[in-house]
């Protein structure tokens, strides 16, 4: 069983209900028409709940769950694994009437919500963690101010975990300046949606950067239907190596690359060309001139 299906089952998520669909209409259907219908519904809801339009935490959480749902249900193998669990635990054929089944589902959801609350209450927290989460929130607000996309919301939990465990510097500036936004031709790399395959491709094409690529993330807006290009964020460990890789791809892009750009556009800094002189107080501090304090 795939890791993403294990995650969904572990959280007892009803992916069909998240997509505002009836499980019975899709049970056992894995054909192209079913997949197309699921993706169409996902696109409609993703526009409604996208964090770029609705920055509230409830929208962020819902958007993350929508991405989780389409990742599982649009893949026939993952959908088959998930449907087997759904048929056994969420919607078992137990001879209950429709009204009785509805009441059973409500009780199960209430129990699951109660169990989640107990787990969350037992996890606790501390002031330092809250401070780091607030700093991460400030970062998201700055990105919204400059019109930057919010990146890969498919792995939102991973981003929050990183922001609350690393230093502020590690989770913001360094990561951003070392990130490249790459657009790939979907058909150019076999099973491009698998980060291991994409990393293997990068190692083959750019072996000199094999140990410099720190992470590979996927945009939440990707649609893995073979007809659209795929947006990927490539994070390196060193800003100098990031610049070298960027210029190397720009000069001689491999066939799989459609586009490559820095994650933070240099255009954002064009308005900072004006020189502003330092005031005398700051100049004295930089020169090491002692500051006179009036004690009267």
Curated annotation (Swiss-Prot):
Keyword DNA repair annotated: no
Any one cellular-component term (Gene Ontology): spliceosomal complex
Keyword DNA damage carried by entry: no
InterPro entries assigned: DnaJ_domain (IPR001623), J_dom_sf (IPR036869), Pre-mRNA-splicing_ERAD (IPR052094)
Keywords, ordered alphabetically: Chaperone, Cytoplasm, mRNA processing, mRNA splicing, Nucleus, Spliceosome
Domain J per the UniProt entry, residue ranges: 14-86
Purpose: Involved in pre-mRNA splicing. May be involved in endoplasmic reticulum-associated protein degradation (ERAD) and required for growth at low and high temperatures.
Family: Belongs to the DnaJ family.
Quaternary structure and partners: Associated with the spliceosome.
Protein name per UniProt: Pre-mRNA-splicing factor CWC23
Source organism of this protein record: Candida glabrata (strain ATCC 2001 / BCRC 20586 / JCM 3761 / NBRC 0622 / NRRL Y-65 / CBS 138)
